[in-house]
Amino acid sequence: MLYNIMLEVAKGDYITILFALILFDFITGFLKAWKWKVTDSWTGLKGVIKHTLTFIFYYFVAVFLTYIHAMAVGQILLVIINLYYALSIMENLAVMGVFIPKFMTARVQEELQKYTAQLDAGKDLLEEFKGEKK
């Protein structure tokens, strides 16, 4: 019975939508880091781990809630997770220069400042390494 529920949840639209949003968020996040030239393996690994754990967590919560016939709660949780991923995707696109809604301007400015600081820190480190800055 549990196996059938796991298959039912895996074939469901909710899991497919969540997977698509997670994949798109990961891709836009990678492209954002690549555009700003701040890619590093640790950040990418953290992103893969975070997205994978989010997907696995929701999948098993959905299986459990389907098992106890309370999937309505799971759908509410999924809407919250999907909104978080949609916001993250819009933030990634905005940092890359794509048009964004006005309500996201402050968040995007924070992200831009973060990446600018990372770039400045990298330049300082490079200058120190070359012996140009004392």
UniProtKB/Swiss-Prot annotation:
A GO-annotated cellular component: host cell membrane
Disulfide cysteine pairs (residue numbers): none
Keywords, ordered alphabetically: Cytolysis, Host cell lysis by virus, Host membrane, Membrane, Transmembrane, Transmembrane helix, Viral release from host cell
Compartment(s) of residence: Host membrane
InterPro entries assigned: Phage_holin_4_1
Membrane-crossing residue ranges in chain numbering: 15-34, 55-73, 78-100
Membrane-related topology note: Multi-pass membrane protein
One Pfam family linked to the record: Phage_holin_4_1
Organism domain of life: Viruses
Function description: Produces a lesion in the cytoplasmic membrane allowing the phage lysosyme to attack the peptidoglycan.
NCBIfam families membership: holin_tox_secr
Family: Belongs to the bacteriophage holin family. Cp-1 holin subfamily.
Listed name of the protein: Holin
The organism of origin for this protein: Streptococcus phage Cp-1 (Bacteriophage Cp-1)
